[in-house]
């Protein structure tokens, strides 16, 4: 998983195995640590609606399951999903099919 912060946007890039894990209800985690301190942490999961929350422990991004499920059978494709979180902030989700993949 790669998370890129841009002006008014968060870009999330997953490989196919990570995307499949989201569809199965698993939570993806990414943390950057220095010594014992968490400098950056994010959790991404699927749920009933789009939510972005943050706190001392990091961010949690919940992506709408229905939109993920509708997107899955259209892969591979060049464009990703875009979500408007409000206040001009966008979430872009892309699935990199050149990386690892799972079958089944």
Language-model segment annotations:
Residues 10, 30, 48-50, 55-59, ...:
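One face of beta-strands
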Residues 77-104:
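C-terminal charged interaction modules
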Residues 3-5, 10-14, 59-63:
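Short, structured motif recognition centered on aromatic/hydrophobic residues
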């Amino acid at each position: 998983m790669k998370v890129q912060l841009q002006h008014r946007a968060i870009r999330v890039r997953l490989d196919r195995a990570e995307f499949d894990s989201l569809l199965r209800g698993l939570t993806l985690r990414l943390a950057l640590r220095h010594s014992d301190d968490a400098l950056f942490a994010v959790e991404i999961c699927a749920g009933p609606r789009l939510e972005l929350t943050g706190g001392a422990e990091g961010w949690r991004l919940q992506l709408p399951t229905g939109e993920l499920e509708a997107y899955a059978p259209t892969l591979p494709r060049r464009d990703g999903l875009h979500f408007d979180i409000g206040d001009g902030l966008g979430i872009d989700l892309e699935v990199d099919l050149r990386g690892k993949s799972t079958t089944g």
